[in-house]
Every structure is written in structure tokens, then in C-alpha cells.
């Protein structure tokens, strides 16, 4: 069953009428019903197109968090063959919020790392809603080092509200683990590609996203802190999240303009949650293109290009 966001209410009402007419048409199949159904479908498509053509940053935040948006496991199942996950950080334990392993992508070995939020109550609890603890980031570092040793490119699929802020995570060195992850990304001699799938939240995202190429889905967000957290800090009022989202420049369109990301991956009309398979294909094609552009670079060139990319951020604003 499709889940609608608050601002999608006009479209929801139209699609409810369409469903009613489809049921009636299946029973009676009269020309009048068929004609009305065609008109309503066209009206709903136009309404959806107009709505998504002018989304505010706060509305994009809601789309990025949509419960039916495709997650890490969907993309891995969609275009990674023979994926073999590895567990544990060899220091404390395993963290299910970050999944990582090796597989085949278009006939080439690849290391895939990313946050998994979960799709239902049980899986969300298992994966801690994609909020990783230090052992998750240390596991990611271990995988990146393995990939570097064997000359395998790294693909990071980012979807997290941030690193887990619990006391246990702080006790085990959350900040250090995030810093080590960021350093590992920047130090790799193999190409690395990051895709911001939904939320790219703070250090929890950057720890696996400091890559040669950063791709971002059209309605994803990438931010130093959630709009709610920023509103609480700036105005001591979390209800001003909409104002914070507008001020923070968190959308793919703004971040492309500022040179923070390299390419926007288009989503189907109405967002990735309406057509996961098309979204997965679009991400796959974008990753193929990005890897192709880096494939012939030597390890030193890969590091140099990545270094220049990040050092150049902010110089041309």
C-alpha cells in the first residue's frame, strides 16, 4: 500500500478516485467510466509533476526519509552479483547499521559499503535505523583497506540521519572512528564512488562518502546536521526545521552548484519510492559512468584527483 506524505494530499485524493474508478471499470467496463478514468489519470500525473517540480528543501527532506524509498539492500540486490558481506571490526564487534562486503559489478570485482535503515519494525531495530556505532565505521575502514590491497574499487551507498549519538558509542570512540573512516576514504589508491541515496547526515555520512565522485539522487539531502537539530541549535526551536532546511542548502541542486557533489541522479516522477526499479537502474548507470572515468588512473593519480577535489571546495563560491 502506497504511503503519502502530508504535502502529497491532493495527489492522494486523485489517486484514490482513480482506484475507485478502476475497480468500477473492471466490474462494468463502460466507455464513460474509461473516459473519466483517462482524464483523472492525466490530471493526477500533471498534479504530481507540478508538485515535484517545485519541492521546497523541507519537502525534499520528507521525500528523502520516505519509508518506501529504496534502501542499501535494494540497490545491492539490484545490481551487485554474488555479494558476500563481511562482519566485524576486529576490535569490538559487528554493527548491522553498516553493511559491507565484496561482489561483482558489471563483470568487475567491487567493494560495497553502506548504511541500511531497515524496511519494517524488526529490520529497523536490527539495523538501528541506519545510525552506526564506532564498530560500523571501523568495519568500513577494514573493508576499504582490503579493497585497496587487492586493487578493488569501492562503492559507498549512503543513507543515514547521522552517526549514533548514544553514550556507548561515545565511550568506544565515535568521533575517532568517523575521523578514521574519512581518512581511509581520502587515502585510497583505488577509485571510490559515493551515492547519497536518501539522507546524508553529518559525519555519519562523510565517514564513507569522502570519495573521488559523489553522486546524489534528485530528492536526497546531504547536510551537516538534520534540519530539526539545526533549528534547535540556531533558534532553540525544533519546530523551525523548515526554516533551517531552507537556509542550510541541503538539496542536490544546491550542492551541485557549490561543487560538493559531482552529479545528480534523476528520480522517477513522484520520487524514488514510487518506482524503485527505475531508480536502481539510474543509479547503476551513473556508477558505471563514474567508474569508467576513473578506471585508467594510477593509484597516485586517484589520490591526487580526490585531494584536489576536496581542497578546491569552497574556493569558487
Swiss-Prot record:
One of its GO terms (biological process) is fatty acid biosynthetic process. It is found in: Cytoplasm. PROSITE patterns: COA_CT_CTER (PS50989). Pathway: Lipid metabolism; malonyl-CoA biosynthesis; malonyl-CoA from acetyl-CoA: step 1/1. The keyword tRNA processing does not apply. The lineage of its organism: Bacteria, Pseudomonadati, Pseudomonadota, Alphaproteobacteria, Hyphomicrobiales. HAMAP family: AcetylCoA_CT_alpha (MF_00823). Its EC number is 2.1.3.15. It is an enzyme of class 2 (transferase). Acetyl-CoA carboxylase is a heterohexamer composed of biotin carboxyl carrier protein (AccB), biotin carboxylase (AccC) and two subunits each of ACCase subunit alpha (AccA) and ACCase subunit beta (AccD). Belongs to the AccA family. It catalyses: N(6)-carboxybiotinyl-L-lysyl-[protein] + acetyl-CoA = N(6)-biotinyl-L-lysyl-[protein] + malonyl-CoA. It comes from Beijerinckia indica subsp. indica (strain ATCC 9039 / DSM 1715 / NCIMB 8712). Keywords: ATP-binding, Cytoplasm, Fatty acid biosynthesis, Fatty acid metabolism, Lipid biosynthesis, Lipid metabolism, Nucleotide-binding, Transferase. Residues 39-293 form the CoA carboxyltransferase C-terminal domain. Transmembrane segments: none annotated. This is Acetyl-coenzyme A carboxylase carboxyl transferase subunit alpha.
